[in-house]
Amino acid sequence: MRHTLTAQVLAKALKNLYPNVKLAIGPIIENGFYYDFELDKSITIQDLPMIEKEMKKIISSGNEIEKKYISKEKAADLFKNKNETYKVDIIERSEQQGNFSTYYQKNTDFVDLCYGPHLPSLKHIGPFKLTKVAGAYWKGDSKNKMLQRIYGTAWKNQDDLKKYLNMLEEAEKRDHRALGKQLDLFHLSLIHI
């Protein structure tokens, strides 16, 4: 639940910082979450501290979370009015007719689709870290538009977060691609035969 809610806060932070962003999906994954989005500015790893700062500001509000179930038609209209084309696509392609789960941060205009359970308020989010940026095709299809993706993780306490980040750092050091470069094991020839 912590990862789900933190992904929603990331989406809200992106909306605050970049009002023209179009949100796609923000599922949880093992030990974290990601959020895909379309934005005319390329987000880099250097942008993550600013985004984290905005997320902390949102979390500090302690806003309560409200989950509402609405019909397919109402859900499509809601996201059309917000110009959220990816959300509309998800809704329109769904065979589901009713009970679309929507997530609201009270005292804000932010709303998103969300299927998972939620903590009751933002004050329950623990320490988090945005970890990397990447690209991803909409619906995993290279014929579709390339979106941007931000990965993150959230933990119950600072010690658990620190342990996880240390584990990631150690795994990165052992990555065969990095080791190959460091040990000069791979060579590319520029000579064409």
Regions found by a protein language model. Name each.
Residues 1-17:
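Active/ligand-binding-proximal structured segments within catalytic/core domains
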Residues 13, 22-28, 34-191:
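Auxiliary tRNA-acceptor-end handling modules of aminoacyl-tRNA synthetases
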